[in-house]
Amino acid sequence: MDAVRLRRVNRWLAQGLGGELADLYVDSHETPAAEAYRSRSRLDFLNRLTGDIRRPGFAMVIAETDHLVGCAFGFPVAGDGFWWLGFDGALPQGIEQPTASGGVFAITSILVQPHPQDQDVARRLQERLLSDHQASFGATLVDPDDHPTLAALRSWRWLDVGEVWRPAGPTMFRALVLPLGERTTARLEGLAHDASTRWPG
């Protein structure tokens, strides 16, 4: 792969890239060859992207060579904690307080064109997206059957903090957080122990 460049794009540029991002989404997911399924999958992604772009603080980083090879995007979690709606049990205090103060940034999607170096590109994308925000935590939700993504996030020091039940899409997601900064990491020593007991693998 040629040298990969990372670049931040604003919401208007992200909207203009919608078609390319949808192609990237379909290419980066193992989908049946049936055209109807691919079209529905593409449309579902575009609808989610449109919804995310409208959220306050939306941010996106793209990876390019001579063409688009990856992207990561998300938004700050609102202080009302709505993003955690459906969390199974009590939200850990170490997460609840930063959420209330606006210190959590949610990564809603990381897409990378399949390639032997795709894990490194994905890691760089998430690091760049989070480094641009003064957040205490990164947060994301993952389908529990998406074992490659769960394994990759865990190798990047994301912690599994529980389950979130949502009415749409997969019934249940694994909720993961990434402590950012030494003080945050130290504050989460107990959470790390909890993560090791909750992790399904």
Protein language model features and the residues they cover:
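Conserved active-site tyrosine of GNAT-family acetyltransferases
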Residues: 25, 152-154, 158
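A short helix-loop-beta-strand connector motif used in the catalytic cores of GNAT acetyltransferases and
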Residues: 48-62, 77-84, 106
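Short amphipathic alpha-helix that is part of the acyltransferase structural core
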Residues: 1-47, 55, 60-69, 73, ...
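Conserved acyl-donor/pantetheine-binding loop and adjacent beta-alpha core of acyl/acetyltransferases
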Residues: 73-111, 117
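Conserved catalytic-core motifs of GNAT/GCN5-like acyltransferases
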Residues: 141, 157-174
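Conserved acetyl-CoA-binding loop-helix of GNAT-fold acetyltransferases
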Residues: 107-131, 155
